[in-house]
C-alpha cells in the first residue's frame, strides 16, 4: 500500500461502479464501510449526472465487526433486490471489506434471487480501476450469454451473412463508459461514421445498455473495441466463444479513422468508398503555410494506453511534432505502449507515480504536454502548455458541448485542443516583448499562470537532475545577463536555443552561462 497525493486509478470496485452506473437495469451491492461511499461524487460532480450511481452499500461500522457481518451483507442484498428489482445484480466488496473475507458474492449466489447474480472478485491490493471495469464487464457478459453458448465444433458465423439476409450489416460498440474520456460524444460520432458506411449500430455497451441488450450482442456481425482498457477481455471472449471478429483499430485521428473504415469494409464485404477526411479541417491546415509553425514541436505524452498511442501517432505522422516522451499508467496495456514508443525510438514510461512522470517531463523539456489532469498541474508548475487527452479528468474536461475525440469531427476537436495552447504561447511571447509599453501591465499575462516563487516551484533542470541523481552544486547556472538575453529570443525557438547553449556549456566545462556564452553557442551551432 502506498500513501500518495494523487493516483491515476482508483481501486477496482470503482471500476465496477463505472460499469453499473453506465448501464440501465443493473444494481451493485458493495460490501464496504461508510468511508468508501466517496466514489458517488465522481459521478455526480465530475460526470455532472443528475442521479447517484445504482449502488447499495452495506456501510458496516467498527461495532459491527464484533458480530455477524455476513448477516448484514445478506440483509443488504435482499433489501436491494426487493427495492430496485434489477435485471442483473452485481455483488462485490471494497478494498477495506476485502480484509474481512465475508465473500459477499458467494453469499448472494446462495440466496436464490430471481435475477442473475454476478459475483465480483476484484483483488484490491494488486489490481486497479480499469482492470476492475474490464473484469466486471467481462463477467456480466459471460454470465448473461452463458445460455446462448454454441455447441463445441460449430463453424464460426460468416461476417458477410447480412448479404444473404437482405439487410445492412450490424456491429457492436464495446467499451464506452462513464468517467471515460468523451465517451458519450465518441459514441455519437462513431454512429454517424458507421451510418455513412452503410452499417447499423446494434448494441452500445456498457454505456446506456441494459442486460437485455447484452444478450443481443451475438446477433451482430462484429464487435468494435473502442476502448481496450474496458472491452478487450470481453471482445476476446466473444471471439473465442461465438466466433465474432473484433475491429481493434481505434478511430482517433485522420489516419486511424481511414484505417478503421477500410478494416470494417474488408471484414464485412462492403464496397470501398471514398474516405470522408474532407469533413475534417485538420488535413487542410496541415498542408497550409501556417502549419509550419508547428513542425518539429517537442511533445511529451502520458495518458491511458488508448489515448497515448493515438496521440503519439497523430503528433508524429499528422502534425509533424517530435514526440520526446511517451508513457502510460495502464499496466495491462503496457506492451502496446512500449511497441508504439519503440517505433519512435523512445523507451516508454509505464508508471503510476505522478512525481516520476513530472521528472521525466522536465528532463524531456517539451514545448507541449498531452496528458491527464495531473499532467496539467505538473506542466503548469514547469511553465509548459498542456492539453488533457485522457482520464483521469476534471469537471472542465467533461464539456456540455459536443466534443468527440473519434472520427472526422474528433480530429477537429483534437487539433483545436492541441494547437491552441501553442498559439497562445506565441501570443504570450508577443505580449512579453511589448509588456514595457504603457498600455500593457503584468496582469495581462494570465493564460497559463507563471511559476510560483519559492521552493515549491521546481525548476525543470533541477527536477531532471534529481531524477538522474545529480548534485545541485553541479548544475548549470544562468547568469542574469544570460537570462535576460534568453528572454528576448522568440518563444517558439527559445527552448531549442536554451538546450543548445547548455549543451555547449557542458562540453566546455562552463558552469555560469552569461550572454557571451549564449552568443558563442549560437555562433557554434550556426556553422
Swiss-Prot record:
Annotated residues for binding of substrate: 425-426
Pfam families xref list: Oxidored_nitro, PCP_red
Keyword field: 4Fe-4S, ATP-binding, Chlorophyll biosynthesis, Iron, Iron-sulfur, Metal-binding, Nucleotide-binding, Oxidoreductase, Photosynthesis
Pathway given in the UniProt record: Porphyrin-containing compound metabolism; chlorophyll biosynthesis (light-independent)
Required co-factors: [4Fe-4S] cluster
BP terms from Gene Ontology: light-independent chlorophyll biosynthetic process; photosynthesis, dark reaction
Domain of life: Bacteria
Enzyme Commission numbers on file: 1.3.7.7
Entry keyword RNA-binding: no
Reactions performed catalytically: chlorophyllide a + oxidized 2[4Fe-4S]-[ferredoxin] + 2 ADP + 2 phosphate = protochlorophyllide a + reduced 2[4Fe-4S]-[ferredoxin] + 2 ATP + 2 H2O
Primary role: Component of the dark-operative protochlorophyllide reductase (DPOR) that uses Mg-ATP and reduced ferredoxin to reduce ring D of protochlorophyllide (Pchlide) to form chlorophyllide a (Chlide). This reaction is light-independent. The NB-protein (ChlN-ChlB) is the catalytic component of the complex.
Assembly and interaction partners: Protochlorophyllide reductase is composed of three subunits; ChlL, ChlN and ChlB. Forms a heterotetramer of two ChlB and two ChlN subunits.
UniProt record similarity statement: Belongs to the ChlB/BchB/BchZ family.
Name the UniProt record assigns to this protein: Light-independent protochlorophyllide reductase subunit B
Name of the coding gene: chlB
